[in-house]
């Protein structure tokens, strides 16, 4: 089809659908003996979009993945953390099964099971939540608990979390109510003492109190443009009882709280049992024994813990696990950089000793998997900067010395006589 203002005879043209002339519209598109204006095209698009929205609920009734299928999908993207993946797969399956059956089964009301992820930084908490949302094709948003404050104080309202979720699905309330919200750094809103405070803690216990109803399930009134700045606009009513909340945090020091409980034997005085250092459990083993009382001592209020009945603990990643993360997942870091280099027509090779060196460096930094990208980026920075301006480079090889900063990557050229290193 072509865009026309006048036909060959010089006659004024009109839209065949609405009858407007070419001077009343921006564009007039010509077909065989008919014309359609841009306004009618927009109207057709709106009609189609409305029909898609009506069909969408039927598509959502497609088969829900089983816990085994969810776990298998997580295995494709997340290395290790087997117990956490099992717990998450079952919790997510039960949550969406509950939604599909209208919150009831044979007259029994099914409760909501939000999830608490406990594990060191870089252990995969955020990645697990993102991967679940991608598998289930539901809206997903992340929030940082450290930026939240009680209503009326400077900072983000907890309702802003729901507003972000609505943004992810173009303010489609029905879609948002099937979404997943991941609240990171949840350990940072612990109260400063496990005793109730006489002073107001607006970013600690106050935020926990504000999150209670949101996480448990309430009808949140959310303005489409967010915040408290537009009091006159119409509010959207979002039922948060259908939204799955996953809270995650490193909980540094929680292992010591658990150790004080589990490693002190029975008895007092001369009858007390004192465990030797060799008998003491590792941090991962201790975290797997977490109880609600430990979280209360850490600084979470009992009511908040009660809203997060499913607890999954993640272990600190070993050097071997970091090497696997570098090369095995579908979106492994080495595969991502190889794809980037392929766009330049260049192959990228990571030798095994280079992967070992990257993992060792990340372990030394204590940043877990999150630190891997910065190490690889630093090693490849100069090469990626120069490569678009270079010719005849066929391959780039990364070895241990490159990661250690002792040499530049090996560049292999198409012409054997031009082979050079570190140019």
From Swiss-Prot:
Family to which this protein belongs: Belongs to the ClpX chaperone family.
Gene3D superfamilies (alphabetical): 1.10.8.60, ClpX chaperone, C4-type zinc finger domain, P-loop containing nucleotide triphosphate hydrolases
ClpX-type ZB domain ranges (all copies): 2-56
Entry's Gene Ontology BP terms: cell division; proteolysis involved in protein catabolic process
Keyword presence, Lipid biosynthesis: no
Name of encoding gene: clpX
SUPFAM superfamilies per UniProt: Glucocorticoid receptor-like (DNA-binding domain), P-loop containing nucleoside triphosphate hydrolases
Gene Ontology molecular function, alphabetical: ATP binding; ATP hydrolysis activity; ATP-dependent protein folding chaperone; protein dimerization activity; unfolded protein binding; zinc ion binding
Protein role: ATP-dependent specificity component of the Clp protease. It directs the protease to specific substrates. Can perform chaperone functions in the absence of ClpP.
Source organism per UniProt: Salmonella enteritidis PT4 (strain P125109)
Gene Ontology, cellular component aspect: HslUV protease complex
Assembly and binders: Component of the ClpX-ClpP complex. Forms a hexameric ring that, in the presence of ATP, binds to fourteen ClpP subunits assembled into a disk-like structure with a central cavity, resembling the structure of eukaryotic proteasomes.
UniProt protein name: ATP-dependent Clp protease ATP-binding subunit ClpX
Keywords tagged on the record: ATP-binding, Chaperone, Metal-binding, Nucleotide-binding, Zinc
Binding residues annotated for Zn(2+), in chain numbering: 15, 18, 37, 40
Protein origin, superkingdom: Bacteria
InterPro entries: AAA+_ATPase (IPR003593), ATP-dep_Clp_protease_ClpX (IPR050052), ATPase_AAA_core (IPR003959), Clp_ATPase_C (IPR019489), Clp_protease_ATP-bd_su_ClpX (IPR004487), ClpX_bact (IPR046425), P-loop_NTPase (IPR027417), Znf_CppX_C4 (IPR010603)
First and last residue of the signal peptide: none
Binding site for ATP: 120-127
């Amino acid at each position: 089809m072509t865009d026309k203002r006048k036909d060959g005879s010089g006659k004024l043209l009109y839209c065949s659908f609405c009858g407007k002339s070419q001077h009343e519209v921006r564009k007039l598109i010509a077909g065989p003996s008919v014309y359609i204006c841009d306004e009618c095209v927009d109207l057709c698009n709106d009609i189609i979009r409305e029909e898609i929205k009506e069909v969408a609920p039927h598509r959502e009734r497609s088969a829900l993945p089983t816990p085994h299928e969810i776990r298998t999908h997580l295995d494709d993207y997340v290395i290790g953390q087997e117990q956490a993946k099992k717990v998450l797969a079952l919790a997510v399956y039960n949550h969406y099964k509950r939604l599909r059956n209208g919150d009831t089964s044979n007259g029994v009301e099914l409760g909501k099971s939000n999830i608490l992820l406990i594990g060191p930084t870089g252990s995969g908490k955020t990645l697990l939540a993102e991967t679940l949302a991608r598998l289930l094709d539901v809206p997903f948003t992340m929030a940082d608990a450290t930026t939240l404050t009680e209503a009326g104080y400077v900072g983000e309202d907890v309702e802003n979390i729901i507003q972000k979720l609505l943004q992810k699905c173009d303010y489609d309330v029905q879609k948002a109510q099937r979404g997943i919200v991941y609240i990171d750094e949840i350990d940072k809103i612990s109260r400063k003492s496990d005793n109730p405070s006489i002073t107001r803690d607006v970013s600690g216990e106050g935020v926990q109190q504000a999150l209670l109803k949101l996480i448990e399930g309430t009808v949140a009134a959310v303005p489409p443009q967010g915040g408290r700045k537009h009091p006159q606009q119409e509010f959207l009513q979002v039922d948060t009882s259908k939204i799955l909340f996953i809270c995650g945090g490193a909980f540094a020091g929680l292992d010591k709280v658990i150790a004080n409980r589990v490693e002190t034997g029975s008895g007092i005085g001369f009858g007390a049992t004192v465990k030797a250092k060799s008998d003491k459990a590792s941090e991962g083993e201790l975290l797997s024994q977490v109880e609600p009382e430990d979280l209360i001592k850490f600084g979470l209020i009992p009511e908040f813990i009660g809203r997060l009945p499913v607890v999954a603990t993640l272990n600190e990643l070993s050097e071997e696990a970091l090497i696997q993360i570098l090369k095995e997942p579908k979106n492994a870091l080495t595969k991502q950089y190889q794809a980037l280099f392929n766009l330049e027509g260049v192959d990228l090779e990571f030798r095994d000793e280079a992967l070992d060196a990257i993992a060792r460096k990340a372990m030394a930094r204590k940043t877990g998997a999150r630190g891997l990208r910065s190490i690889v980026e630093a090693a490849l920075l100069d090469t990626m900067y120069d490569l678009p301006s270079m010719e005849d480079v066929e391959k780039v090889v990364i070895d241990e010395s490159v990661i250690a900063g002792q040499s530049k990557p090996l560049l292999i050229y198409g012409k054997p006589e031009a082979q050079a290193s570190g140019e």
